[in-house]
Amino acid sequence: MAAKDVKFGNDARVKMLRGVNVLADAVKVTLGPKGRNVVLDKSFGAPAITKDGVSVAREIELEDKFENMGAQMVKEVASKANDAAGDGTTTATVLAQAIITEGLKAVAAGMNPMDLKRGIDKAVIAAVEELKTLSVPCSDSKAIAQVGTISANSDETVGKLIAEAMDKVGKEGVITVEDGTGLEDELDVVEGMQFDRGYLSPYFINKPETGAVELESPFILLADKKISNIREMLPVLEAVAKAGKPLLIIAEDVEGEALATLVVNTMRGIVKVAAVKAPGFGDRRKAMLQDIATLTGGTVISEEIGMELEKATLEDMGQAKRVIINKDTTTIIDGVGEEAAIQGRVGQIRKQIEEATSDYDREKLQERVAKLAGGVAVIKVGAATEVEMKEKKARVDDALHATRAAVEEGVVAGGGVALIRVASKLSELRGQNEDQNVGIKVALRAMEAPLRQIVLNCGEEPSVVANTVKAGDGNYGYNAATEEYGNMIDMGILDPTKVTRSALQYAASVAGLMITTECMITDVPKGDGPDLGAGGMGGMGGMGGMM
């Protein structure tokens, strides 16, 4: 076992605070509308430029192991805030630094660390309740656009795109962010259900100008099996031909004789058919086939439940107003499934989302909900260079998370004003003893830190602005972008309540643990090893007399 280096008391806390300050000072330059960028050196490729707090925090590793422990604990604050709300990482880091700095001063002055922590926790619990009372619902497009704009570092185009996307696919819809091909940002909305499977044969194409298959009011056959024998298909094909409608076959696979016969029938104009593979694999494929069945009012033909393809009738088929199939995707528009059945299926999947343990499963389930509920929006980010594209994409991603958080828990006045108002309301809060009262004061003083840092990044005097804002009430605050005072909500400067709440809770949680630290243990750095000196191989000393 490696030897350990142990530090106690003030020695440990000073080292830890130094690490906290290095990380927080690097992160907090990005805060606010006039925050600066940070350039990150990468081991390969061009350097990355970012204004995202958590991206900066993740890059920091310090040489001194004790200082690094302090930095890593604050990195945890940024990561947790990012996981919970998708934004507010810089605010969380600034709050953590403020609580730790003030808290360690109190410890050095002889206060009891455990009582300080209890005081901080009490203040944060009360602050969260106050934030809830200050919160106003965020339901209209204008408010959503404002939240998106603030979170994307005052980029109005991004805010408007996100609001437009939410209008089109609903608040619960799936919105994804992708690299664009031009200089402008674009919004692409896929209505209906789309999945990543294209036609099985190019001979099905009936729109040569677009290279796509378009079927109007088709029957949709859903089969959870491979189809290779055409005899299984004959009753279905005959029934569809009599009905005079096209047919879409979605199956595990269609191959050999069955595929060849379908192609020949299509080319001769006997029946208009197209075949695609079912989306997904294994259990997920079964579930997605069931989703399509619910959307189109059909039944999945599966031998597991005793259904055979030869006995399938038109009643077992799904139907839709239109189907478009190209090389890579299939889109089903306006399925005829009953609304109640679709909502029931959506409710079922939402229950699975709540119980899902992995992010991947959750993401896939959310995609299924969106496909059933109305569509998917894709924001294509445009930029002149790859470096700018990466930076912008990270901002759009942050803005998207922030708007979702705003829809979920509402919004409060931005620019650090909400925390200032909360601190003012809690000025009479008291603990069980004097040390707890100091802990409460530490937390309330720290709540001014985000506003002070935003002002500092503008090049103004933080104390002057903080005192002016404190003298006002309600949503009165300082607009750092225009350097004016006024009503923050009216000026469109909003923060999602969830983002502010998460930042405060995670900052206080980690800061409380660090204030109560009395001892730090780490491995002793390994030396360079014994100096073997010049000379040949070991054991050859004394061989010089061989001449």
Swiss-Prot record:
Positions that bind ATP: 30-33, 51, 87-91, 415, 479-481, 495
Pfam families registered for this protein in UniProt: Cpn60_TCP1
Summary of the function given for this chain in its UniProt record: Together with its co-chaperonin GroES, plays an essential role in assisting protein folding. The GroEL-GroES system forms a nano-cage that allows encapsulation of the non-native substrate proteins and provides a physical environment optimized to promote and accelerate protein folding.
Family: Belongs to the chaperonin (HSP60) family.
Lineage, broadest ranks: Bacteria, Pseudomonadati, Pseudomonadota, Gammaproteobacteria, Enterobacterales
SUPFAM superfamilies named in the record: GroEL apical domain-like, GroEL equatorial domain-like, GroEL-intermediate domain like
Molecular-function GO term, any one: unfolded protein binding
Reaction equations catalysed: ATP + H2O + a folded polypeptide = ADP + phosphate + an unfolded polypeptide
Stated name of the protein: Chaperonin GroEL
Subunit (UniProt): Forms a cylinder of 14 subunits composed of two heptameric rings stacked back-to-back. Interacts with the co-chaperonin GroES.
Main location class: cytoplasm
Location of this chain's protein in the cell: Cytoplasm
GO biological process: protein refolding
CDD domains given in the database record: GroEL
Gene Ontology CC terms: cytoplasm
Entry EC no(s): 5.6.1.7
Keywords: ATP-binding, Chaperone, Cytoplasm, Isomerase, Nucleotide-binding
Entry-linked InterPro entries: Chaperonin_Cpn60_CS (IPR018370), Cpn60/GroEL (IPR001844), Cpn60/GroEL/TCP-1 (IPR002423), GroEL-like_apical_dom_sf (IPR027409), GROEL-like_equatorial_sf (IPR027413), TCP-1-like_intermed_sf (IPR027410)
Superkingdom classification of source: Bacteria
